[in-house]
C-alpha cells in the first residue's frame, strides 16, 4: 500500500520542511518554477489516477545550482524509465531551471530501501529533512542521512544487503518517531502499510 499523500504532507510539516515544500505530485510534476528559491517536492513515478507506484524526492538548491534527485532504490535513469516509464531529464526540461545555464544534477546512486519495502515515501521525507537543514550536502555527511547505509543497487537482493536495508528501515522508523508527532500517533498503521516485506505480502494475498 505504501504512504498516502496526506500522510507524507503531515510528516513533512512535522519535520519543518513545509516552508520549502511545493507538495506531493504525480509524474506530471511541473518542475521548479522559481529558480531563486530553495524548494523541494515528493513526486510519484506514476499518474495519480493509477494509485501511484514509487515515490521520489526532488530538491533545488539555488546557491550552488544543485538539482537533487533522491530515489530510495538508487535506480539509474534507464532503469527508472524501464520499470516506471519515468525520466528526470524531461522533468528538468519542463522546469524554469532549464534555461538557467549549467545545472548540477546530484543523484542518489545507492539503495537504502529494501526491494519489497513500501516505505519509499517515508525515506523521501527523511531525505528532505536533510535537504532543508544541510542543502549543500543532503545525500551524505549529515546527521540525518548518515543514519542509513547504502548498498549498490545491483546487490540489493543479496542476503547481506537485505540485512543492511532492514536496519535502514528500523532507523527510518526510529528517526520519524523522534521527529514526527503524526508518525508517533499513527505508527502501527503506517508501519503495516510500509513494512519491509509489504510487496511480498500483497503478492501472496
Swiss-Prot record:
One of its GO terms (biological process) is proteolysis. GO terms for molecular function: cysteine-type endopeptidase activity; DNA binding. Keywords: Autocatalytic cleavage, Disulfide bond, DNA-binding, Host nucleus, Hydrolase, Late protein, Protease, Thiol protease, Virion. Requires DNA and protease cofactor for maximal activation. Inside nascent virions, becomes partially activated by binding to the viral DNA, allowing it to cleave the cofactor that binds to the protease and fully activates it. Actin, like the viral protease cofactor, seems to act as a cofactor in the cleavage of cytokeratin 18 and of actin itself. Signal peptide: none annotated. It is found in: Virion; Host nucleus. Belongs to the peptidase C5 family. This is Protease. It comes from Bovine adenovirus 2 (BAdV-2). The gene is L3.
Amino acid at each position: 500500500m505504501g504512504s498516502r499523500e496526506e500522510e507524507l504532507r503531515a510528516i513533512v510539516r512535522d519535520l519543518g520542511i513545509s516552508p520549502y515544500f511545493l507538495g506531493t505530485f504525480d509524474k506530471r510534476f511541473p518542475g521548479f518554477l522559481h529558480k531563486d528559491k530553495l524548494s523541494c517536492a515528493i513526486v510519484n513515478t506514476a499518474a495519480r489516477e493509477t494509485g501511484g507506484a514509487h515515490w521520489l524526492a526532488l530538491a533545488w538548491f539555488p546557491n550552488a545550482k544543485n538539482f537533487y534527485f533522491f530515489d530510495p532504490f538508487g535506480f539509474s535513469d534507464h532503469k527508472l524509465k524501464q520499470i516506471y516509464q519515468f525520466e528526470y531529464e524531461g522533468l528538468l526540461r519542463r522546469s524554469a531551471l532549464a534555461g538557467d545555464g549549467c545545472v548540477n544534477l546530484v543523484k542518489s546512486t545507492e539503495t537504502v530501501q529494501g526491494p519489497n519495502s513500501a516505505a519509499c515515501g517515508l525515506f523521501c521525507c527523511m531525505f528532505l529533512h536533510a535537504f532543508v537543514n544541510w542543502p549543500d550536502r543532503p545525500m551524505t555527511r549529515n546527521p540525518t542521512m548518515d543514519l542509513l547505509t547504502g548498498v549498490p543497487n545491483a546487490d540489493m537482493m543479496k542476503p547481506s544487503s537485505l540485512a543492511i536495508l532492514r536496519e535502514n528501515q528500523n532507523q527510518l522508523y526510529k528517526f520519524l518517531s523522534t521527529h514526527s508527532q503524526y508518525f508517533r500517533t499513527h505508527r502501527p498503521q503506517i508501519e503495516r502499510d510500509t513494512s519491509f516485506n509489504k510487496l511480498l505480502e500483497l503478492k501472496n494475498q
